[in-house]
Curated annotation (Swiss-Prot):
Keywords: Coiled coil, Cytoplasm, Cytoskeleton, Microtubule, Repeat, WD repeat. It is found in: Cytoplasm, Cytoskeleton; Cytoplasm, Cytoskeleton, Spindle. This is Echinoderm microtubule-associated protein-like 2. One of its GO terms (biological process) is negative regulation of microtubule polymerization. The gene is Eml2. Residues 10-649 are annotated as: Tandem atypical propeller in EMLs. WD repeats lie at residues 56-93, 97-144, 151-192, 195-234, 241-280, 285-323, 369-406, 410-447, 452-489, 495-535, 564-602, 609-648.
Amino acid sequence: MSSFGIGKTKEVIFSMEEGSVKMFLRGRPVPMLIPDELAPTYSLDTRSELPSSRLKLDWVYGYRGRDCRANLYLLPTGEVVYFVASVAVLYSVEEQRQRHYLGHNDDIKCLAVHPDMVTIATGQVAGTTKEGKPLPPHVRVWDSVSLSTLHVLGLGVFDRAVCCVAFSKSNGGNLLCAVDESNDHVLSVWDWAKESKVVDSKCSNEAVLVATFHPTDPSLLITCGKSHIYFWSLEGGSLSKRQGLFEKHEKPKYVLCVTFLEGGDVVTGDSGGNLYVWGKGGNRITQEVQGAHDGGVFALCALRDGTLVSGGGRDRRVVLWGSDYSKVQEVEVPEDFGPVRTVAEGRGDTLYVGTTRNSILLGSVHTGFSLLVQGHVEELWGLATHPSRAQFVTCGQDKLVHLWSSETHQPVWSRSIEDPARSAGFHPSGSVLAVGTVTGRWLLLDTETHDLVAIHTDGNEQISVVSFSPDGAYLAVGSHDNLVYVYTVDQGGRKVSRLGKCSGHSSFITHLDWAQDSTCFVTNSGDYEILYWDPVTCKQITSADTVRNVEWATATCVLGFGVFGIWPEGADGTDINAVARSHDGKLLVSADDFGKVHLFSYPCCQPRALSHKYGGHSSHVTNVAFLWDDSMALTTGGKDTSVLQWRVA
């Protein structure tokens, strides 16, 4: 027996007699069978090879409108800039091309464009590394043409997150203001090119939603948020504030947005649905538009021609106002896209609208709006790639199922279902899709018409995996009730009948792979068990020699001889959520709890194998899959709700 890396954290033991390797997760042994052809030459001391291929971020699906604002702008290059997860996206709609700024290491929360329309600032939240080291919140100033980082501000200064950022609009835009999410919501002003703080001041105990400079007077700033609006003066290195006085006007719970009109008037929109005009330089209301929206006014945008556009929350309306604050035109955003979060001026009379349901729309108040960027709204776990097309499916907590084209980057179709979804799998014909939900219900959908073909219920816990056998004759449904339900499949996936259930795991089912010849399948469970099953009898296969040399059609199980090298030292067994092997059998991609995507060579059977590592997601990466032709890999984010498409090169 030779052993490797003896230590409390993770020991790997190779037994030649048993033809197995044993690793330990949380002190629990996980024995894995070595195929006969590898056993004679296998050694734990062989160095793993880095894959010659790399991943390059190709497309980002999604937008963060749910809880961020003023984060969508059109640049002179024709690109719209916005963010999701830890990626700032520059999307050229005409060329159908994206570029990505990847300087951040956790969620981006705010974005500002410099008056030069090239320089961009983005602020991020505090994060932690895999080792538990804090990653401090900060602001990055970068060049949108070269994507190079110019300056990093505020490391060790900001607390929790940077929630607002803005450049001064006059004086060459040489100042930048930022607000953090500390208890005092500190407003700070920076000479960003020198990376030096000019001054800071406690802003408010309550949430601050906007901080901005006056367009012509660089010594004036405005902040607003929960039950306040402040007018700030910056003089001789100190900040002084005057509170906005509502006097006889209804004081709103939240002042949600602010913009400036040509004459110097300040306009605010609030949670009461009112627009207030604050006379130039003053802190008093000089005009009001009551009930401009039913529900909050979430967005304001002053247009080039001096008119004003507002966007509504509950009423989902985009309204164009004349110079006398009379309503000129209005249009409602379709309900599926959700309330308006932010509005940006496009070319001509076009507008870009970001919504709280993480969509970006393009259109005008005259013509209405159509979808430009579709996003998921809540945690995303289900991912499956089509067996013979450049398409994939995502589904999640938001009860939405999207079938995407990886080439057009748009949904081919979308449908809502009754329960939050957790898993997905295509029939080998590609004509039927299974979707597992958190309630024990699972559905079969027609992939052409997206019609419901059938609905079944197994147990009352979440269905973590739905997987058709390679020959299309069986469907295995793995549940959090520790059972795998096996169905026979007819009519190309349209008719299923329950054959039996596989009982033997003492914890919930996490992953499942079929044999290439469909004669058996293997499962992983929440307590790191690997079991093998005969679908015909639904009985466990206990003879090691029966399964040792099986060729597996896929490698999605995170525990097994071919993949155990993905586990880092000290891993606790829940750190890696998903793994996928390329169809050509050369690459393996893993998705972890630290926002990272790793690319390994396959088989990955040396302890702590070498990998290329990629950021972009900002919370746990929940799933990973290769497109049918291995040209792209796809990863899904948990809390960041994004889908990242990686080119394999």
